Amino acid sequence: MKTKKIKSIIKKSANQNVLSLLLITVGLALIAVAAYLANTASSAIPTNLVKAPNSKQLTASSIKPSTKAVSSYSVAPTLPKYINIPSIGVNARVLRLGLLKNGQIATPDNIFDTGWYDGSAKPGQKGAMFIYGHVSSWTADGVFYRLKKLKPGDRIIITRGDNKIFTYIVIKSNVYPYNAVDMNTVLSPISPNTPGLNLMTCTGQVIKGTSEFNERLVVFSELS
């Protein structure tokens, strides 16, 4: 009788262990799937369906982030954290941004921040990294106000979440009508075999009766 009871206990314990392992395996699989989807949701969108960012900078906040907010800013190890452009005095955070419901790339809520489109490449990665920054608000110059002054050979320095540095060299700049931006080109590296970084901001004039600038400036650079 005791032997049967012991066997029953052993069998029950074994079944419980198998069930526990199964639940753990399923849980880990779900976590992995969730992480994958979080990292690839925007990148799964074909570039020809992605629209250029809007120009809500005129209504974006112009309150400068505190020194502490900037210095304590953190992101995942492989994502862009800071952008530094020595020739035009840019030192800013790089926020992670996705797509709006209408297919436009979202933009930062503050004119002193920049935004990395998470459907584009990461620092040093094959393809092109895309970063957007505001040119101004109604009352202040934005982070990319002097972007038009960049010239070929200027450096753009990206600090990643793990503090690894990537230096890109400006190749050229293009200006597009606000409603005719070729996002396939903007989201592609200027040299197919070299990781790229393309920056965008608004330029030109404000369209009468709107808060929309009539042009977009894109700076193309590649990893040095």
Predicted features along the sequence, with ranges:
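Residues marking helix boundaries in flexible regions
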Residues: 7-11, 25, 64
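N-terminal Lys/Arg-rich, disordered targeting/topogenic segments
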Residues: 1-18
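Solvent-exposed, non-transmembrane regions of membrane-associated and secreted proteins
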Residues: 27-224
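Hydrophobic H-region at the start of alpha-helical membrane spans
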Residues: 17-30
